[in-house]
């Protein structure tokens, strides 16, 4: 239905939250009786999705303020759509992209990125408070003028650190044209400088969630060896499930 969804990556090739770790708990010197702790799902106002790969597991939250993308993603996860699909396009210091249904059992020689799920594109849901910081979960798209999203392909940002001067240049050269009323907040500037991202995509592609655990997995996948076309030499398969 949609052609060349991976336009996102072809454009950026020219241009080119935080991991949660459990504190180490000291064991008591003596234990009289083992106790069994009940496992409780994380409490969150947003829906949480677990993304499992050979390089580790990520947990992402889906923003309630982007309900069209949130609900579509949940539907696909719950149906098993993403299971056994690949992160088929990987660019270090940029992003890892997946969700093309054609990537399941795809031969190594196949160019991926043009596939879609049944149904229409998802209308754009740009929000000023959602931006392409490291760990951002966003929707890929083709070059349609409405900037509507692919109904299945997504990417997770690795990016790189951006200082204030660089961010101002990016804003003036592109982001401002995407949305003249948008301005970076002080907090957003600090985040780009501290953890990085891909600011040149802001207000141009819909960000609908973010990785809140397993951010190191993004770095591991983004660092794999790739072939021409940015497909990993060794397939990076995914499996997803909703946590709440």
Name what the model sees in each region.
Residues 1-23:
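Bacterial Sec-dependent N-terminal signal peptides
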Residues 20-244:
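Cyclophilin-like peptidyl-prolyl cis-trans isomerases
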